[in-house]
């Protein structure tokens, strides 16, 4: 039987991500479960250069748009009670969660 749950979280909004991470950590600490993390992973930076003029005539001026994706990993003991509470955590729309039993 798996003894740990690895929770991967990622979002482009770091405030929402930290809010969910704190909820999970506080929930695990209240139940007395061993928690390791949150472990910050490298931030992925995606940049898209877009030409300002749609028709391409004149000087070529570019706008640069970027999006940063922040990632965290939390390892907790996989107890049935904790996993049920984990499913009840309110998650904003811009935070994505993946749970893996290891």
Curated annotation (Swiss-Prot):
Gene3D superfamilies: Ribosomal protein S10 domain. InterPro entries: Ribosomal_uS10, Ribosomal_uS10_CS, Ribosomal_uS10_dom, Ribosomal_uS10_dom_sf, Ribosomal_uS10_euk/arc. The keyword Plastid does not apply. It comes from the Archaea. It holds the Pfam family Ribosomal_S10. The keyword Ion transport does not apply. Keywords: Ribonucleoprotein, Ribosomal protein. One of its GO terms (cellular component) is small ribosomal subunit. GO terms for molecular function: structural constituent of ribosome; tRNA binding. GO terms for biological process: translation. Involved in the binding of tRNA to the ribosomes. Part of the 30S ribosomal subunit. PANTHER family: 30S RIBOSOMAL PROTEIN S10 FAMILY MEMBER (PTHR11700). Belongs to the universal ribosomal protein uS10 family. This is Small ribosomal subunit protein uS10. It comes from Sulfolobus acidocaldarius (strain ATCC 33909 / DSM 639 / JCM 8929 / NBRC 15157 / NCIMB 11770). The lineage of its organism: Archaea, Thermoproteota, Thermoprotei, Sulfolobales, Sulfolobaceae. The gene is rps10.
């Amino acid at each position: 039987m798996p003894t740990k749950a690895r929770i991967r979280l990622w979002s482009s909004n770091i405030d929402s991500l930290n809010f969910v991470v704190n909820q999970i950590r506080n929930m695990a600490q209240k139940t007395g479960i061993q928690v390791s993390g949150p472990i910050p992973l490298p931030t992925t930076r995606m940049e898209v250069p877009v030409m300002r003029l749609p028709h391409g005539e004149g000087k070529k001026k570019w706008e640069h748009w970027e999006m940063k994706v922040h990632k965290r990993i939390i390892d907790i003991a996989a107890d049935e009670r904790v996993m049920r509470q984990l499913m009840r955590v309110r998650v904003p729309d811009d935070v994505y969660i993946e749970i893996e039993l290891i």
